[in-house]
């Protein structure tokens, strides 16, 4: 299981216990105060300690892919179909079908994904945990998951909650007459809440915009506790024009263009209804996280009427978009475009819209003798008044088959966006077609190089005249573009030679171009006129070059080590690389290369931890990599900051030895912002310069404890071997083929 972690520092919640029957309260006395309570500005390393294997009850040797592949997926689908139309008295199905309810569950599970940092999404099934299980926009989805518990219980380890929720959404669509695009399994479950920055607000429904009125990065939802946008309009203001702007911003940050956005909303609102039988403020109790232990994880208890069925309260909006909410039809677009809509209010007092010539034509969800008018949200009307959305809606309305395909593909993208490349997909229902957002790779049509070839290629690379530091920087830049949050980036594909990566400032484009040109020459020379069918990709050669340089640096330190290398990477084409999609992977800070853009709002050290979490690193791995890369002179821009050694290019522990040397006194530079000077305590002579990232390994008590290990006299070999191990891990982060072989 890979880690999908944070943003900003997270203060641990106070422990809670049952104080008496039916009550849950925080300890008034005896609860431990976290260090963040006393020193909120301390560097938080918890992102690097989340989702460790000890929290997984299946154990470290559990192979989810293997378990999933034993699953009879058709049997699971059959059980889901039976559940859809088996209404339960404790939570009756609208129109006798839970399909729309399960679509909302799957949508909201996947819809937290955001492109800027790759966090959120269906993977991990985080909808089960706080805060998502108690977000206002997820009201009553606790019941949807409980309805699925008998199926999860039946199949156990063979299907994760993440896969089951998405699969259920698919089956629900199919059971109501819609043809989905496919399904890929592979979402391993998490066992604790992700540490994710969801916004600065301290109250639900607070605005997620910055002081300039722009939606804060990396967020996608416009208000705290929402998946996308406020259905009543921005901050509850029923302005369709403003709502269209919010929709475009929010869905765009979730990787959807205008056509995909329109297709998703129109397709999703074809089904089901909204629930606002009465005022939530007067009727609805605490969310699951705030409910008593006797509620057993359920929340939003409704004391009005029966509290369920016709009396259900979820969003406060009330009604359906069509007269047949449990079948796929074109009625949503028919109704949106053909009616004139006027503003009204739901029984709960929420802003919504009804036809100007409203008639009671919609069947009641529970009483066949009743009928109701159609309704639309402000965000639905936005699709009619916005020129771009309106044009797409009219085109889809005129061409139903085009709409069906667009919705099918958009739904597939929504529910699979955070699963990563197609190589991670499991099951027989995976579509054969490659989609550009999956970051496709070509299939190698040649034999892989062997040990003798690898040795010869390393010899040629080291003899090429390319500086060893540049080989290391290039390999690191290529591999460290990976992020474990959505499994994008990495060395496979050699996209560092393509736009936009080849022009990223952190990659030193001018130097990078020279290295790539040299490696391409070696590649061409090796591949030319081969008769044994073997070829080497540039992607493999980039990693091999860095590894050869690391081995050379280790030899200079007196250690003969072999950096593990597994060929098999391929070279993507520019046509397989969506420039706009890859642009969000560009780092504005990389502590491993001492790179930091001053436009960042968070500190260099915080962003280093965030970067390390995206590389799935532990605290010791992050520490040894920073120290090693400094010794190898691998900073961006050829910066000398943190190169605390008189023998750069030697894989030594000098960074830690010199950082912890008490003969050096550190002060802020008076001439260079963000720079610190290390001077001899006695003479005042300048010895070193460093960044805040460098110094935090001496100032943070937890990082210093690890740094002391690597600075010790007996740690020279340990440092080298730990660095090689961590380096290899980063080089192989996107080698999903190795992890399943």
UniProtKB/Swiss-Prot annotation:
PTM per Swiss-Prot/TrEMBL: Formation of the three residue Trp-Tyr-Met cross-link is important for the catalase, but not the peroxidase activity of the enzyme.
Entry keywords, A to Z: Heme, Hydrogen peroxide, Iron, Metal-binding, Oxidoreductase, Peroxidase, Signal
Required cofactor(s): heme b
Enzyme class: oxidoreductase
The keyword Metal-binding appears for this protein: yes
E.C. designation(s): 1.11.1.21
Record note on cofactor: Binds 1 heme b (iron(II)-protoporphyrin IX) group per dimer.
Classification via Gene3D superfamilies: 1.10.520.10, Peroxidase, domain 2 (1.10.420.10)
Numbered residues of crosslink Tryptophyl-tyrosyl-methioninium (Trp-Tyr) (with M-254): 107-228
Marked site (Transition state stabilizer) residue numbers: 104
Family statement: Belongs to the peroxidase family. Peroxidase/catalase subfamily.
Subunit structure: Homodimer or homotetramer.
Protein name, as recorded: Catalase-peroxidase 2
Species annotation: Burkholderia ambifaria (strain ATCC BAA-244 / DSM 16087 / CCUG 44356 / LMG 19182 / AMMD) (Burkholderia cepacia (strain AMMD))
Source organism phylogeny: Bacteria, Pseudomonadati, Pseudomonadota, Betaproteobacteria, Burkholderiales
Gene for this chain: katG2
């Amino acid at each position: 299981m890979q880690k999908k972690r944070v943003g900003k520092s997270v203060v641990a919640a106070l422990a809670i216990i049952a104080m008496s029957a039916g009550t849950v309260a925080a300890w008034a006395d005896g609860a431990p105060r976290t260090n963040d309570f006393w020193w909120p500005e301390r560097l938080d390393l918890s992102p690097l300690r989340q989702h460790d294997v000890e929290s997984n009850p299946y154990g470290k040797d559990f192979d989810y892919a293997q378990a999933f592949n034993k699953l009879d997926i058709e049997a699971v689908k059959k059980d889901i179909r039976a559940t859809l139309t088996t209404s339960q008295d404790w939570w009756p199905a609208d129109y006798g079908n839970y399909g729309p309810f399960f679509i909302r569950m799957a949508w909201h599970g996947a819809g937290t994904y955001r492109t800027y940092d790759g966090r959120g999404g269906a993977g991990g099934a985080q909808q089960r945990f706080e805060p998502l299980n108690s977000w206002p926009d997820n009201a009553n989805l606790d019941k949807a998951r409980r309805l699925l518990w008998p199926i999860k219980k039946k199949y156990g380890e063979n299907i994760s909650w993440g896969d089951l929720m998405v699969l259920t959404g698919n089956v629900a669509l199919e059971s109501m007459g819609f043809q989905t695009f496919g399904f890929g399994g592979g979402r391993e479950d998490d066992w604790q809440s992700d540490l994710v920055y969801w916004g600065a607000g301290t109250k639900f429904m607070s605005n997620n915009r910055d002081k300039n009125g722009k939606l804060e990065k990396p967020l996608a939802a416009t208000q705290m506790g929402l998946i996308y946008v406020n259905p009543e309009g921005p901050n509850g203001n029923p302005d369709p024009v403003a709502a269209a702007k919010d929709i475009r911003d929010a869905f765009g940050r979730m990787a959807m263009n205008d056509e995909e956005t329109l297709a998703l909303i129109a397709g999703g609102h074809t089904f089901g209804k909204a629930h606002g039988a009465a005022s939530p403020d007067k009727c609805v109790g605490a969310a699951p996280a705030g409910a008593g232990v006797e509620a057993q994880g359920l929340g939003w208890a409704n004391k009005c009427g029966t509290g369920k069925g016709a009396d259900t309260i979820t969003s406060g909006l009330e009604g359906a978009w069509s007269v047949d909410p449990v079948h796929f039809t074109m009625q949503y677009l028919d109704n949106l475009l053909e009616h004139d809509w006027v503003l009204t209010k739901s029984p709960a007092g929420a802003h919504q819209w009804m036809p100007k010539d409203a008639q009671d034509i919609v069947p009641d969800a529970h009483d066949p003798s009743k009928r109701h008018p159609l309704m639309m949200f402000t965000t639905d009307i936005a699709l009619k008044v916005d020129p771009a959305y309106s044009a797409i809606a009219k085109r889809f309305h005129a061409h139903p088959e085009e709409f069906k395909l667009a919705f099918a593909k958009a739904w597939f993208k929504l529910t699979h966006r955070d699963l990563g490349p197609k190589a991670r997909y499991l099951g027989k229902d995976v579509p054969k077609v490659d989609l550009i957002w999956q970051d496709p790779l070509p299939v190698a049509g040649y034999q892989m190089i062997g040990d003798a070839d690898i040795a010869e290629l390393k010899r040629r690379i080291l003899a090429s005249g390319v500086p060893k530091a540049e080989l290391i920087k290039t390999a690191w830049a290529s591999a460290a573009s990976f992020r474990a949050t959505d499994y994008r980036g990495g060395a496979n594909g050699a996209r560092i030679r393509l736009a936009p990566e080849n022009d990223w400032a952190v990659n030193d484009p001018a130097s990078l171009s020279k290295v790539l040109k040299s490696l391409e020459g070696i590649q061409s020379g090796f591949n030319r006129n081969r008769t044994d069918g073997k070829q080497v990709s540039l992607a493999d050669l980039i990693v091999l070059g860095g590894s050869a340089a690391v081995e050379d640096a280790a030899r200079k330190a007196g250690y003969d080590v072999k950096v593990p290398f597994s060929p098999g990477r391929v070279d993507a084409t520019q046509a397989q690389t969506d420039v706009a999609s890859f642009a969000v992977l560009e780092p504005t800070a990389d502590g491993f290369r001492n790179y930091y853009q001053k436009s960042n709002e968070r500190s260099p050290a915080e962003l280093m931890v965030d970067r390390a979490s995206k590389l799935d690193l532990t605290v010791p791995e992050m520490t040894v990599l920073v120290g090693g890369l400094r010794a190898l002179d691998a900073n961006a821009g050829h910066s000398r900051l943190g190169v605390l050694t008189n023998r750069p290019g030697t894989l030594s522990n000098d960074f830690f030895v010199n950082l912890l040397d008490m003969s050096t006194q550190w002060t802020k530079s008076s001439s260079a912002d963000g720079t610190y000077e290390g001077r001899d305590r006695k003479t005042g002579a300048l010895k070193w310069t460093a960044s805040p990232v460098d110094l935090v390994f001496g100032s943070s008590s937890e990082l210093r404890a690890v740094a002391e290990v690597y600075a010790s006299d007996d740690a020279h070999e340990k440092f080298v071997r730990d660095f090689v191990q961590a380096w290899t891990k980063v080089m192989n982060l996107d080698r999903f083929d190795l992890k399943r072989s």
